[in-house]
Amino acid sequence: GMRNILVISLVFLLSMVCHAQKIATSELNGTKWKEISPTYDYCERGMTFTMDTRTTSTKFYKTGKEFNCPLKYYISSSIPETFDSSQIGKSRKGSYIIQYVDNSVFWFKIVDISSTKITLLSKLGDTTVYQKVK
């Protein structure tokens, strides 16, 4: 009956949320994103990708100053134990953006991606939504 349909659709929705989306390095290459959730009153945040670098940017409204933080990355289908620098710049497909921060593996899970938006869940447990700029 109706209840079964609700349960099934709920299970389907939950599985959609839990299953990460796959992306290729070549698809991220050359893209630019603006953070839309969370938002900040005092700054605008964003990120850009090349084949081997993910650069996060913070632009402060008051001063107009922009700070960029470029970090090497690679795409992986799982979270690695150690950072494999030989994978940087290679076109791979997977659900995780892998970076090396403070001598350890830092990761973002690609929870959702469309032609206009990307949702990332970080190792620290926070979720960030970006809108595509180009």
Label each residue range with its predicted role.
Residues P38-C43, T58-T116:
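Contiguous, well-ordered beta-strand patches that form the walls/edges
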Residues T25-C43:
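Tryptophan-anchored aromatic micro-motifs
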Residues R45-M51:
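Broad, structure-driven detector of short, well-ordered beta-strand segments within folded domains
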